């Protein structure tokens, strides 16, 4: 092989290696920042079609209804724990160490984002509450619509009482 061809081959191999390294770093960065959406039932039992369950330490988003009577506040800090459930009967515990949104209340739909710290326990970094009685996050509405009809709220829930 003459020196000119050897130089071209070395350059081509280096270029292909560089592109492969950049692509792998890009995919790694995207994968570590990816937040998959789950319902409480999917966290407990896995997704219906694939059986995929979130791993401990994985960043996820979970949506459902706050279980009435499940909220426990720590009087000495902002720490709060509550359960969320879906129509299929799945329920998980969410822990949160910050101020809850003003519209947050039991019996309402929420989406929580955070890290799965144990089976059935989400350490939330962000909690989003619905805006009014007609709004439901698209992911939650889709998940709830797959299992049963639209949820009806009683008068106490509509008025914002606990």
Curated annotation (Swiss-Prot):
SUPFAM superfamilies: Heme chaperone CcmE
Record's keyword terms, sorted: Cell inner membrane, Cell membrane, Cytochrome c-type biogenesis, Heme, Iron, Membrane, Metal-binding, Signal-anchor, Transmembrane, Transmembrane helix
Domain of life: Bacteria
Gene3D superfamilies: Nucleic acid-binding proteins
Cytoplasmic topological intervals: 1-8
Topology, Periplasmic side: 30-162
GO biological process: cytochrome complex assembly
Transmembrane segments: 9-29
Keyword Disulfide bond tagged: no
Intracellular or extracellular location(s): Cell inner membrane
Role summary: Heme chaperone required for the biogenesis of c-type cytochromes. Transiently binds heme delivered by CcmC and transfers the heme to apo-cytochromes in a process facilitated by CcmF and CcmH.
Protein name: Cytochrome c-type biogenesis protein CcmE
Species assigned in the record: Shewanella pealeana (strain ATCC 700345 / ANG-SQ1)
């Amino acid at each position: 092989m003459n020196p000119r061809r050897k130089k071209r081959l070395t350059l081509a191999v280096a270029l292909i290696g560089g592109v492969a390294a950049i692509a792998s770093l890009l995919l790694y960065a995207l994968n570590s920042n990816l937040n998959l959406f789950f319902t409480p039932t999917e966290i407990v039992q896995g997704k219906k079609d694939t059986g995929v369950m979130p791993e401990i330490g994985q960043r996820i988003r979970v949506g459902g209804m706050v279980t009435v009577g499940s909220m426990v506040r720590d009087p000495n800090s902002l720490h709060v724990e509550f359960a969320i459930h879906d129509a299929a009967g799945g329920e998980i515990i969410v822990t949160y160490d910050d101020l809850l949104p003003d519209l947050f209340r039991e019996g309402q739909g929420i989406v929580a984002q955070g890290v799965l710290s144990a089976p059935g326990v989400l350490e939330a970094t962000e909690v989003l509450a619905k805006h009014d009685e007609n709004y439901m996050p698209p992911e939650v509405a889709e998940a709830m619509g797959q299992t049963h009809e639209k949820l009806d709220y009683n008068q106490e829930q509509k008025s914002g009482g606990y």
